[in-house]
Amino acid sequence: MLVDASVIVAILSREPGYVELEKRLAAADTPLIVTPLVKFEAVVSLARQKSTPQKPTPSLVRQAQQAVDAMVEDISASEVPISSEIGRLAIEASTNYGKSVGHIADLNFGDCFAYASAKALGVSLLYKGNDFAHTDLA
């Protein structure tokens, strides 16, 4: 199962619904997977949450990275690289479900790569929110 950045952020920020996401991770009967882009998106999002109205400081980014890395280790997730196939599928995801084409799923850059990674690896995608519910991964 590919773990989307939205799940990592929700759990580390203790957003509403985070306990259910923790339970789903614990109950997963397949290996958990992240990508460098998932980690990047989670780090940036967490650092932004902790910042003042100004942009996050390098220290906040490093703290967020440590938190994300620790969570990935705690859930024993494997990190897989972004391949050419994933890149191709991300473009396809953007074409079919992206913000750029006005699709209701409204997938952004990170979402398109999470979608593509799950597709390329043939695994399910654990996410928070409604965006992926409007794709064929739902």
Task: Walk through the language-model features, giving the residues of each.
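PIN-domain endoribonuclease scaffold, especially VapC-family toxins
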Residues: 22-33, 37-106, 112, 116, ...
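Histidine- and aromatic-rich ligand-binding microenvironments
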Residues: 4, 34, 107-108, 129
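A generic structural signal for short hydrophobic patches within well-formed alpha-helices
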Residues: 8-9, 39, 132-133
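Residues that recognize and position ribonucleotide moieties
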Residues: 1, 32, 125
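C-terminal structural segments of small proteins and small subunits
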Residues: 117-125
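Short, locally clustered residues in the helix-turn-helix/winged-helix DNA-binding domain
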Residues: 13, 47, 119
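Metal-dependent nucleic-acid phosphoesterase active-site entry motif
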Residues: 1-19
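Gly/Pro- and small hydrophobic-enriched strand-loop and loop-to-helix capping segments
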Residues: 126-134
